């Protein structure tokens, strides 16, 4: 198991969103949070495979149901002049695709997924939770490969995140109606085939 740590390369600033865009390369994973730029460490192969598996499953489901568009970890959310997080996975509903521009998403996505790495623990569980809640990201999934758990947070009618508990070992999304996963799938080696998982999920929808 990889040791947990909260250390991360960062540039304290304060920087604006425009500074962030000018300073960070397009191929570099980074976040702007409260004027501070956090540069992600290179991914290990396990995290990369986990990201790829989940990204494909969500993308195929969203496409099959014609719900919206899924974006990877280089899509920044321009929330305001000092905040531009880049979720590992961002889903935008069809009704909100006008927010999507070539270089960024203007405002919140509807669902954000963060895959926890040793240097992002504090940001994913604390800073980004607050930021996504305040911005109005309807669902926030924290996928913690280190602890082998998935935390699903959903905005309530007061705009506060509430944790959604599994039902019969499954986590169900409301932003993606009909979508669910078994967290255990993410930790299996090998993981179940993506096409088989999609067929099982879609099979319940008739």
Predicted segments with their positions:
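Gly/Pro/Ser/Thr-rich low-complexity, intrinsically disordered segments predominantly at protein N-termini
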Residues: 1-206
């Amino acid at each position: 198991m990889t040791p947990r740590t909260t250390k991360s390369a960062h540039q304290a600033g304060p920087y604006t969103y425009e500074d962030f865009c000018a300073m960070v390369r397009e191929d570099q994973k980074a976040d702007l949070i409260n004027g501070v730029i956090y540069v992600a460490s290179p991914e290990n192969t396990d995290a990369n495979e986990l990201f790829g598996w989940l990204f494909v499953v969500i993308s195929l489901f969203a496409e099959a149901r014609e719900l919206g568009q899924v974006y990877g970890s280089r899509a920044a959310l321009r929330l305001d002049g000092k905040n531009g997080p880049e979720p590992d996975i961002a889903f935008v509903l069809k009704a909100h695709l006008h927010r999507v521009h070539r270089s960024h998403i203007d405002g919140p996505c509807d669902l954000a997924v963060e895959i926890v790495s040793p240097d992002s623990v504090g940001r994913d569980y604390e800073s980004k939770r607050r930021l996504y809640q305040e911005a109005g990201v309807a669902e926030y999934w924290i996928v913690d490969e280190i602890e082998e758990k998935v935390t699903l947070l959903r905005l309530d009618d007061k705009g506060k995140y509430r944790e959604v508990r599994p039902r019969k070992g499954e986590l169900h999304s409301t932003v993606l109606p009909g979508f669910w996963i078994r967290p255990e799938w993410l930790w299996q080696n090998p993981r179940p085939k993506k096409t088989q998982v999609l067929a099982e999920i879609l099979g319940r929808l008739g």
